[in-house]
Design a protein with these regions (language model features):
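Conserved catalytic cores of phosphodiester-cleaving nucleases, focusing on short active-site segments
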Residues: 100, 128-130, 147-153
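Acidic, metal/cofactor-coordinating or nucleic-acid-engaging core segments within structured domains
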Residues: 157-232
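A short acidic/basic microdomain associated with nuclease active sites
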Residues: 103-121
């Protein structure tokens, strides 16, 4: 999947949570009304739901335009029940997938939104799975890494409590990751993505001799907090994520927090989704 242009709007910040000394990655979405970038973002999202070839085939078969087909069958609409929620959740999951793949260089299979049974149906299991192989030939190594991310989005508010929710639900990934891996492997195979399906298979054998690897968990939260309050920390100026106390976060050493914020992100999500016409 090509790197989407909107990633140039995402700026990493020095962000902190009070009474919290574990890994925290903080990003601000500093966007504008560049139609080319917004259209590219919309196309990027649409391709998670249905491929170019399948969209063309469906439109030819039914005798409808791509826009009409997408609106009726694929893309959640803001005036539908759960439509805004589906838009918020999906654009957020794809954003964090893009960060992990294009910034942190994990391979992140894209199959979660493909061939859903309904426009607002949410798949169960771990939200995002990514991986890295230590060896170029992909032979199992204990240095291989698997990452599992739980995403929580509140795009209509600027409430940092989304981080608490992400941490709480991320703990569940320790128990559901095996089921998610099995589901992903089979779905990727059905999509014809055989190489990715085989990659996932490697990570289903953690307990097999010679197949151990490292697994990391991410609690990812996103909200419409426009800016962070700046404070001095040593000789550096950092942004403090207010409204949350790190002492309340029961987080282990192999779990980290990603936080993304920006102004009026629900409006941005609708702007992008309304462009999903082709």
């Amino acid at each position: 999947m090509d790197k989407p242009k909107y990633l140039k709007w995402i700026v990493e910040e020095a962000g902190v949570i009070e009474n919290f000394n574990k890994t925290l990655k903080c990003f601000n979405i500093d966007y504008n009304n560049d139609a080319e970038v917004l259209d590219d973002w919309a196309l990027h999202i649409r391709r998670h739901y249905i491929s170019d070839q399948e969209l063309e085939e469906e439109c030819d078969l039914l005798g409808v335009s791509p826009e009409a087909y997408l609106r009726a069958n694929i893309i959640p609409q803001k005036d539908e029940g759960l439509g805004p929620t589906a838009r918020s959740n999906t654009i957020s999951e794809i954003l964090f997938s893009d960060l992990l793949e294009f910034i942190f260089e994990y391979h992140v299979p894209r199959c979660r939104q493909y061939n859903m049974s309904g426009k607002t149906v949410s798949e169960h299991g771990t939200d995002i799975v990514g991986y890295k192989f230590a060896k170029e030939d992909k032979k199992p190594s204990k240095e291989d890494r698997l990452i599992a991310a739980e995403v929580k989005a509140i795009l209509s508010q600027n409430d940092a409590s989304v981080i608490n929710k992400a941490v709480e639900d991320s703990i569940k990934d320790e128990y559901r990751i095996s089921l998610t891996l099995n589901y992903m492997r089979r779905k990727l195979r059905d999509m014809g993505k055989i190489d990715e399906s085989n990659d996932i298979l490697r990570f289903q054998f953690k307990t097999k001799a010679g197949h151990d690897y490292t697994i990391d968990y991410i609690a990812a939260g996103i909200t419409s907090m426009p800016t962070l309050q700046k404070i001095k920390k040593g000789d550096k100026e950092v942004g403090i994520i207010t409204g949350i106390d790190g002492a309340s976060l029961a987080i282990s050493d192999y779990r980290s927090i990603f936080f993304v914020h920006g102004k009026k992100l629900m409006e941005l999500a609708h702007e992008v989704y309304e462009r999903c016409k082709k």
